[in-house]
Amino acid sequence: MWLLGPLCLLLSSTAESQLLPGNNFTNECNIPGNFMCSNGRCIPGAWQCDGLPDCFDKSDEKECPKAKSKCGPTFFPCASGIHCIIGRFRCNGFEDCPDGSDEENCTANPLLCSTARYHCRNGLCIDKSFICDGQNNCQDNSDEESCESSLEPGSGQVFVTSENQLVYYPSITYAIIGSSVIFVLVVALLALVLHHQRKRNNLMTLPVHRLQHPVLLSRLVVLDHPHHCNVTYNVNNGVQYVATQAEQNASEVGSPPSYSEALLDQRPAWYDLPPPPYSSDTESLNQADLPPYRSRSGSAYSASSQAASSLLSVEASSHNPEQPGSPEGSAEPRDSVPSQGTEEV
């Protein structure tokens, strides 16, 4: 029986050393730099106040000087002063800091248990975003009660929904609705502008002759010149538009010319002049203004003398048909020609 006491002490010390993250315990606490835990065990001195509990009773992290926090305003500094966690993870039911300082004094702090947070039955306060998330954040499962669970057919998965979670997202819903309305208005305005632009282009590209005539739309009459037209009313035919004499003349003037008129317009100015008068042979003999003719020998004869000599030779040959080539008949006019038309150079 006396052997059971040391055996149980040995087993308990072995199990205790296995549970701790640092199991390098030693019974020699007289080594300089070592730290003795509250249970009598010793750890290296460098493990004291390092933010991680190395002793089983966490005595190595107690009464440690709090280092100056370097965390931002929206973060929570752990007790060690080394680690920082998100502010809403404070008192959420989970030890987010390595030393568990984020879950200490949760019920005593009135700011942590304000109306903006969820109050658990056990006194803890958690952020409302952790309600009905499928995890026991309150440690008494009070945050997971009264949640509507729905099972989709064939999926095999349970989806947990909560009205409290939907309450905190109204701005997202309003933003989606507003964006949809603005998008529809922009599309409608763009379609209206495009339709107006296309209609304007179609009106600008109408032929000119169609714009010059009145447009009849059912019983409405649109006239370009209302002050220069005649409108007659008939019971059977309705409104009849009658053009004035000025418009008829304008239409006649604007018609293209015929083929014969076009040819007459293209004739030169001298085409319609009368022909020059015809001169007889005797008148041509009396014309002395013709330029003289110079022969190869150097003697100059006028064109009128040449014509007269040729005419005399023809008459002589007609008077003497029997001797057409005699030198007697031809010498007389040849001798007489130079006497009449010879000019000195």
UniProtKB/Swiss-Prot annotation:
Positions in the Cytoplasmic compartment: 195-345
* Membrane-topology annotation of the record: Single-pass type I membrane protein
**Keyword list, A-Z:** Cell membrane, Disulfide bond, Glycoprotein, Lipoprotein, Membrane, Receptor, Repeat, Signal, Transmembrane, Transmembrane helix
Where does this protein reside within or beyond the cell? Cell membrane
Q: Where is this region: Disordered?
A: 270-345
Q: Which residues lie on this side of the membrane: Extracellular?
A: 18-173
Tissue-specificity statement: Expressed in the cerebral cortex and hippocampus.
**Composition bias type Low complexity, residue spans:** 295-318
Per the annotation, the residue ranges of the short sequence motif Involved in ITCH interaction are: 256-259, 275-278
Q: Taking the first listed entry, what is the main subcellular location of this protein, grouped into a coarse class?
A: membrane
What superkingdom does the record give? Eukaryota
Identify the glycosylated residues: N24
Residues passing through the membrane, by range: 174-194
Q: Quaternary state and partners of this protein?
A: Interacts with APP precursor C-terminus. Interacts directly with ITCH; this interaction promotes ITCH auto-ubiquitination leading to its degradation. Interacts directly with NEDD4; this interaction promotes NEDD4 auto-ubiquitination. Interacts directly with NEDD4L.
Protein name, as recorded: Low-density lipoprotein receptor class A domain-containing protein 3
Identify the coding gene: Ldlrad3
